Regions:
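Positively charged n-region of N-terminal signal peptides that target proteins for export
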Residues: 1-4
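Sec-dependent N-terminal signal peptides
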Residues: 6-11
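C-terminal motif of bacterial Sec signal peptides marking the signal peptidase cleavage site
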Residues: 16-19
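Buried hydrophobic residues that stabilize the cores of well-folded domains
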Residues: 23-281
């Protein structure tokens, strides 16, 4: 879900402004010259017995300032909210997390960026200011991710996982290994189109049981429009589910339709609908 949200936010923040009439200038639901995205709201509508609920549940709310910086992310459905903190250069250096209902402080992330070494590190702390985990991202000088290391500090420095990324002309390969012994946990091969989008992902998961190792293979497929926007994601051959995406005329995401199945009996179906509010600068 994180990747989907990052993709959708990128679509929202990358919009080009369109000209509007004077009446539209005062309409907070219409984008236009001299305006900025102030808020994006995501509402969930569940399906049951072939019918969609008329009553939606507030899923997530994103709020932005005039600099296009995220200033608040509220997640009522998941029960938390976060507040980013920026330095004078406009870089997010910290994120604080709170319980959505009680406003109880949950902890924070501290973020460090080293451009010279192409390294980005996130330190995660709990409400007692104890270090829980450290995640280090390493990039090439062309800003391609090549390695991600997660250390579970609350357990021990040798506990965690490593993701290693490698690239060819039309593929991306991701290998997930155990930090402690280097054993292979998962291998994913993404087939890429001319935009660099994954059109097919094949994932092999390795289970190292005492008597005999077992490997399971999962395949996901992705379809895009002529602008490189995702239209449909077909979930693994095991679940046989899918996600479909529709867009507004200005390119912003309008709706996600999600259906997860076991064989052909769909167990979970819902829509995520996106609405936007704009303000004058």
């Amino acid at each position: 879900m994180k990747k989907n949200i990052a993709l959708l936010l990128g679509l929202v923040l990358g919009l080009s402004f369109v000209s509007c009439s004077s009446d539209e200038d005062d309409d907070e639901n219409v984008n236009g010259k001299g305006k900025y995205l102030a808020e994006m709201t995501v509402t969930r509508y569940d399906w049951k017995d072939g019918k969609r609920s008329d009553e939606g549940k507030l899923y997530q709310i994103y709020k932005y300032n005039e600099k296009d910086q995220l200033i608040s992310q509220e997640s009522p459905y998941f029960g938390y909210r976060q507040t980013p903190i920026y330095n004078d250069n406009g870089d997010c250096t910290e994120q604080k997390f709170y319980n959505y209902k009680t406003d109880e402080y949950l902890g924070y992330n501290k973020r460090e960026l080293n451009l010279a070494d192409s390294v980005f590190i996130i330190y995660s702390y709990n409400w007692k200011n104890e270090l829980v985990s450290t995640t280090k991202y390493e990039y090439t000088y062309g800003y391609k991710l090549i390695r991600e290391t997660e250390i579970i500090d609350s357990i021990g420095k040798d506990h965690g996982k490593i993701w290693t990324y490698s690239y060819s002309e039309n593929t991306q390969t991701i290998e997930l290994t155990n930090l402690k012994d280097g054993s292979l946990i998962e291998k994913q091969v993404n087939e890429l189109d001319s935009y660099g989008n994954a059109t097919k992902a094949t994932i092999n998961v390795f289970y190292d049981f005492a008597l005999s190792p077992i490997t399971h293979e999962y395949t996901f497929k992705y379809n895009y429009d002529s602008q490189g926007r995702i239209l449909r994601k077909t979930h693994s051959t095991v679940s046989q589910g899918y996600t479909e995406y529709t867009y507004n005329n200005d390119g912003t995401i309008k709706k996600e339709h999600y259906a997860e199945a076991l064989n052909t009996d769909y167990k979970e179906i819902y829509d995520l609908e996106y609405t936007y509010k704009y303000k004058k600068k």
